[in-house]
Amino acid sequence: VATEADIWRTAGIIAAEYGAEGVSFAGQMALSFEIGGKVEDQKVWLSIMEKVEALTSPASEDAAQLSH
């Protein structure tokens, strides 16, 4: 079972590696688990996708620039 910290950590890695394209990557992962019938894993990847989207949104980037 993935913890909330695990999910945020994974989302951060994906956001750093792929930027906004990481949202699509996480969505594809969620879809693959849905097709495979692994509903709990799909839910984890949907959560990761939402967090990658939050981390890569323009508002998030603006806030990061203001904090430096």
Please provide the spans of the model-predicted regions.
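Long, non-catalytic architectural segments outside compact domain cores
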Residues: V1-S32, G36, E40, S47, ...
